Amino acid sequence: DFEYLQLVLTWPASFCYANHCERIAPNNFTIHGLWPDNVKTRLHNCKPKPTYSYFTGKMLNDLDKHWMQLKFEQDYGRTEQPSWKYQYIKHGSCCQKRYNQNTYFGLALRLKDKFDLLRTLQTHRIIPGSSYTFQDIFDAIKTVSQENPDIKCAEVTKGTPELYEIGICFTPNADSMFRCPQSDTCDKTAKVLFRR
């Protein structure tokens, strides 16, 4: 089984600076994934490999809005669902005893809905277009995550770490917060760019 769930939210402006996006980057965090994991050993591609069922209707629309497949043109993304399928087989497989495909994606949407990280950052005067210390970003997010979040950076331009993703962790049944293990991708001594 697994010890915690990490909801990973991507900042699209940074993602689309580092990757080629077919979708217009929304000005808010979008879901990258919901990752069941253990503190010591990383879990992925668990057996048995689940079968992915394609979403339609309301669930498709909700995912398209809140878990945007930024790299893919919208019609292709909605039909082929490459990002969701990949995430489900890689990560959803590791909590399939507890969550089936519908409950897994439903849970990710429900957990994302608990937080407005952009508003939280803005409340703490952390605004897209400027740079901030790692600690300032960490402390702002911790006001809503209660336990330690995992702030993830990417250094697309050498010497300029930028805020890329934020992980918020939960207990396996998602009823309380869990202290995220730290991925240590941010230079704690440098200013971190919050890309506009």
Curated annotation (Swiss-Prot):
Top-level taxonomic group: Eukaryota
User: What biological-process GO terms show up in the record?
Assistant: RNA catabolic process
Q: Is Nuclease tagged as a keyword?
A: yes
Q: What is its main location?
A: secreted
What reactions does this protein catalyze? Answer: a ribonucleotidyl-ribonucleotide-RNA + H2O = a 3'-end 3'-phospho-ribonucleotide-RNA + a 5'-end dephospho-ribonucleoside-RNA + H(+)
Entries under InterPro entries matching the protein: Ribonuclease_T2_eukaryotic (IPR033697), RNase_T2-like (IPR001568), RNase_T2-like_sf (IPR036430), RNase_T2_His_AS_1 (IPR018188)
Tell me which residues this entry annotates as catalytic.
H32, Q87, H91
**UniProt family annotation:** Belongs to the RNase T2 family.
Function, as annotated: Self-incompatibility (SI) is the inherited ability of a flowering plant to prevent self-fertilization by discriminating between self and non-self pollen during pollination. In many species of the Solanaceae, self-incompatibility is controlled by the single, multiallelic locus S.
Report quaternary structure and partners.
Answer: Monomer.
Q: What is this protein called?
A: Ribonuclease S-F11
Source organism per entry reads Nicotiana alata
